[in-house]
């Protein structure tokens, strides 16, 4: 109740007068003051909030701009706020960078969601090739005897046909598994080997798909904003999402063996504990979670 009242009071009264007072004192609008004071994710986050809570329709709409309209949007903002480019030459550059990050994050979510919604299709030759590629990357010295085979359990699938394990995350789960195995082959082999530990073992592929869901949910909830705003100076792409996934895979394996669960039956408990740890790290405005080998 108190928080709701404070937000109402701040948004409708206090914020307006504070902005007015600061403009009189500094001769600069709130957006300019943010650029003068902050860098990295803090800057983009504060710009996004300033635009979102502005009563000015031009500024409000800026958070919804598509990438192709960013340049024109920046010009509209400068006109609306009476910013002279000759007196503040950096404003245009800084605002464009922020809007590209803001619009890029929204577009990245749409791109990831689009891939996630595509189910694995065994009649799709590209899907089948990708699945076989995963096997060859993880088991280079062992030939897959048949497409439907108990051998899939060797890399952590549950049944004889892996397509059933991709239902939740669609083709996105497979793409992530292949990306990690292709770009961090040595680490993938090491983690696959560790996943066969007699006591602390887990299903490598199933856990990998589970971590795709974690990465996706963090992106959807906007928890990845600080990370991506710091990690990517321009427009975040699927490549950056895959990189974050790789970080999760590597760090989860370390976490699992450090925690030493009594059995795989406690997977959900430790998975959630790991999830909370990552969410905590992502609250830091200076965060940049990159895989460091």
From Swiss-Prot:
Residues 126-282 form the ELMO domain. GO terms for biological process: regulation of defense response to virus. It holds the Pfam family ELMO_CED12. The keyword rRNA-binding does not apply. One of its GO terms (cellular component) is protein-containing complex. Keywords: GTPase activation. It comes from the Eukaryota. The keyword Nucleotide-binding does not apply. InterPro entries: ELMO_dom, ELMO_domain-containing. GO terms for molecular function: GTPase activator activity. Coiled coil: none annotated. Acts as a GTPase-activating protein (GAP) toward guanine nucleotide exchange factors like ARL2, ARL3, ARF1 and ARF6, but not for GTPases outside the Arf family. This is ELMO domain-containing protein 2. It comes from Bos taurus (Bovine). The gene is ELMOD2.
């Amino acid at each position: 109740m108190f928080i709701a009242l404070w937000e109402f009071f701040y948004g409708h009264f206090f914020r307006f007068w504070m902005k007015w007072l600061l403009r009189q004192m500094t001769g600069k609008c709130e957006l300019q003051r943010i650029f003068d004071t902050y860098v990295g994710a803090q800057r983009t986050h504060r710009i996004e909030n300033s635009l979102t809570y502005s009563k000015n329709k031009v500024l409000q709409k800026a958070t919804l701009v598509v990438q192709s309209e960013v340049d024109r949007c920046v010009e509209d903002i400068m006109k609306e706020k009476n910013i002279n480019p000759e007196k503040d030459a950096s404003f245009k550059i800084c605002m464009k960078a922020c809007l590209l990050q803001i619009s890029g994050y929204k577009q990245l979510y749409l791109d990831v969601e689009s891939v996630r919604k595509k189910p694995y299709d065994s009649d799709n030759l590209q899907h089948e090739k990708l699945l076989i590629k995963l096997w060859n990357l993880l088991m280079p010295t062992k030939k897959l005897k048949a497409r439907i085979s108990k051998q899939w359990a060797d890399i952590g699938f549950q049944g004889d046909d892996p397509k059933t394990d991709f239902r939740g995350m669609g083709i996105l789960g497979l793409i992530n598994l292949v990306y990690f195995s292709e770009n961090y082959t040595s680490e993938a082999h090491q983690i696959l080997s560790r996943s066969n530990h007699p006591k602390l073992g887990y299903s490598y592929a199933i856990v990998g798909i589970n971590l795709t869901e974690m990465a996706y949910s963090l992106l959807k909830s906007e928890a990845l904003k600080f990370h991506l705003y710091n990690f990517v100076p321009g427009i975040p792409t699927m490549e950056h999402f895959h990189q974050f996934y790789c970080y999760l895979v590597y760090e989860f394996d370390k976490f699992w063996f450090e925690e030493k669960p009594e059995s795989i039956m406690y997977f959900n408990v430790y998975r959630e504990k790991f999830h909370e740890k990552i969410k905590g790290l992502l609250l830091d405005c200076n965060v940049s979670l990159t895989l460091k080998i």
